[in-house]
């Protein structure tokens, strides 16, 4: 009988209703909501489904698949990975560094941690491996031809990064976030999930869960968030502007472009080099014509495997102690602000450029400067055709869209160099 009682006490069901474990129950419900959004509503399912499963894995009492203490204080504690026992001095250092009481109370002095599955997977995020590999795959799937054919669209991609810096200011002034936390929230405005994860893992790892969920949720809502802003900032006449077809881009230009960008951007913003180099390597594999096997692997098998690991690892950071806080609400709110300012920045710069250009550009393509590829470009096409059914803006919008990918990586490098 005692054996049965001991077994029942050891189950997750019994632990679920003891102490602070009610937070785990709330997080399990949130994970199920995300699964519903990903599977039924199809909101970024390739990321939301793994993220939700990661949430479930880390919030199941007794499963011990992820230990926050291994990464507490923003560092990797390799000695604990090697089986070293937790010491009183170690806990005192973490407490002085501001690590939450929930994390500190998860271990006891003298305890050796049994490394879990997600503990190992999370190393890929902490070391910056997964976001870079995602960028490798993105580069292999991206056609920079529209940007090369219309270099002016690079300015629109840069203007759309306004959302990042306006949100940074808002978080600092209104929500009193630290510089590193504000930078991590601001990067949501780039509409680039891997970049947001890359920056947050370096600057504010405690916020990784809510920021990743916010970034990918709002990316899925681009067709809902952008059109009202685009219509509010443009006139009917502006939305009807037709643009001439883009010139044909030569193979030589497509091969030289990733090489030149890799060198120039890496020298300009060294902190952005890992993301930019992987992005341009993937694109060079696609365009050079002699590495088709590598290009296809980067686009398919590698991208899919890394996406699973990335999603599960990010979801695992969303424990009740970190996710169920006022900061999460602030992050969700500022995420919308970031997307709004990013959209507005691109549209307003396009309108400004039209004051000086003989061949006018449709301001709607400025909204595609956020790097949600190709969703933002499709939104510009759809809104443009609502006003003028014969208008085809998709290829023109792809220029700012892919420029936004480069722009968000550069912005990430700037923020890391300032607050890293």
Where are the language model's segments positioned?
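Interfacial loop/helix-cap signal at membrane boundaries in integral membrane proteins
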Residues: 1-20, 64-134, 201
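Hydrophobic transmembrane alpha-helices of secondary-active transporters
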Residues: 34, 57, 124-148, 283-285, ...
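Alpha-helical membrane segments and immediately flanking helix-loop junctions
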Residues: 127, 135-141, 156-166, 177-206, ...
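Membrane-embedded hairpin module used as a gating/binding unit in multi-pass transport
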Residues: 214-290
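Alpha-helical transmembrane segments
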Residues: 206-224, 334-342, 365-368
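Interfacial helix-loop-helix linkers and transmembrane-helix boundary segments
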Residues: 40-48, 66-67, 120-121, 141-156, ...
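Entry/N-cap segments of selected transmembrane alpha helices
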Residues: 147-168, 321-346, 397-401
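Transmembrane helical segments that form the transport core of multi-pass membrane transport proteins
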Residues: 262-346
């Amino acid at each position: 009988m005692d054996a049965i009682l001991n077994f029942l006490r050891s189950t997750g069901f019994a632990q679920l209703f003891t102490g602070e474990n009610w937070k785990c129950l709330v997080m399990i419900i949130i994970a199920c909501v995300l699964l519903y959004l990903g599977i039924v509503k199809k909101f970024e399912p390739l990321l939301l489904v793994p993220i939700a499963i990661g949430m479930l894995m880390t919030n199941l009492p007794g499963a011990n698949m992820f230990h926050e203490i291994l990464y507490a204080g923003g560092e990797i504690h390799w000695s604990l990975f090697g089986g070293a026992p937790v010491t009183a001095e170690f806990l005192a250092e973490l407490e002085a560094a501001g690590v939450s009481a929930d994390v500190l109370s998860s271990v006891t002095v003298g305890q050796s941690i049994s490394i879990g599955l997600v503990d190992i997977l999370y190393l890929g995020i902490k070391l910056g491996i997964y976001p870079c590999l995602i960028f490798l795959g993105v580069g292999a799937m991206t056609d920079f031809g529209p940007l090369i054919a219309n270099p002016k669209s690079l300015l629109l991609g840069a203007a759309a990064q306004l959302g990042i810096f306006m949100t940074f200011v808002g978080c600092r002034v209104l929500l009193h976030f630290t510089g590193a936390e504000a930078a991590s929230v601001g990067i949501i405005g780039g509409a680039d999930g891997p970049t947001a994860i890359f920056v947050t893992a370096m600057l504010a790892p405690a916020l990784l869960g809510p920021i990743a969920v916010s970034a990918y949720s709002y990316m899925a809502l681009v067709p809902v968030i952008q059109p009202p802003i685009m219509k509010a900032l443009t006139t009917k006449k502006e939305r009807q502007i037709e643009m001439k077809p883009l010139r044909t881009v030569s193979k030589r230009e497509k091969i030289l472009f990733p090489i030149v960008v890799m060198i120039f951007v890496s020298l300009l913003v060294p902190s952005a080099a890992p993301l930019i180099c992987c992005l341009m390597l993937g694109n060079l594999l696609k365009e050079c014509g002699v590495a088709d096997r590598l290009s296809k692997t980067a686009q398919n098998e590698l991208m899919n495997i890394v996406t699973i690991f990335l999603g599960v690892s990010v979801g695992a950071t969303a424990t009740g102690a970190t996710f169920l806080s006022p900061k999460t609400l602030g992050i969700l709110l500022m995420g919308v602000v970031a997307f709004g300012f990013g959209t507005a920045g691109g549209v307003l710069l396009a309108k400004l450029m039209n004051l000086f250009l003989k061949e006018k550009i449709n301001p709607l393509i400025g909204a595609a400067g956020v790097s949600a590829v190709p969703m933002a470009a499709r939104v510009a096409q759809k809104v443009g055709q609502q006003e003028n059914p014969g208008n085809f803006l998709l290829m023109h919008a792809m220029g700012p869209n892919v420029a936004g990918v480069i722009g968000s990586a550069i912005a990430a490098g700037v923020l890391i160099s300032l607050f890293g």
